[in-house]
């Protein structure tokens, strides 16, 4: 069964880009030197600034991410969940634009839809129709685009409350690797889970405004008690990030995280016994011109609500 509908591009990007902040590394890379490999070295701090700070090389490209999620302890999610997000982003002369096609495999069905950020608009695309998001919600969605000056990729990630530079704990450079024909610098770090779950809480509010939480069964909010329980539940988080050696643009991230809450925390978090997340993100065609096309057929926000109501019933 295929249901054409919108799903949370924000949660997809959040989970994938956390990969850039995961701990752990793999052998086989050429060492960058003892100094560069030290945690919190001047070299790695500079690399973080160059990757997520002003960088006119990060003005366009394509994002492709896949997340596999395995939940235990909740019958509603007894089958593995897979989320994918694919789409271009562009500086567009100083006004960041993006289009993400999102697909979610959930309980034997597939949900799919598009999200557009173009000009002053934010839209949701279902099939050949684009639905305008009302100004109050769209303005909040676009507000982070004012940050990350000179880094379009960073601006787009900021829309989804993604800030790896805030989450990195004891970052270090572990080597070099060639990714899709590009020489990259391989970095790793631990995760500041307090900062991570604060951003997750902000993201939940945005998802609720778009009714994503109602449709998917995600929590409408992540309060302080839940954030603390999540922090305590992280058993392992390993990840790797690869940044272009010459242009310092993020090229690839990999992430593997396991949460196993205690019996007490399970009651706070809804009852799951474990969640395993494996994610991969690739950024390609960096610097290549990208065109963001929004369907000419437009639908009203009220019409979108009818479609979302039908979707919510279909996935119960």
Language-model features: locations:
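Subset-of-secretome marker
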Residues: 22-316
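Bacterial N-terminal signal peptides that target proteins for export
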Residues: 1-10
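C-terminal motif of bacterial Sec signal peptides marking the signal peptidase cleavage site
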Residues: 17-20
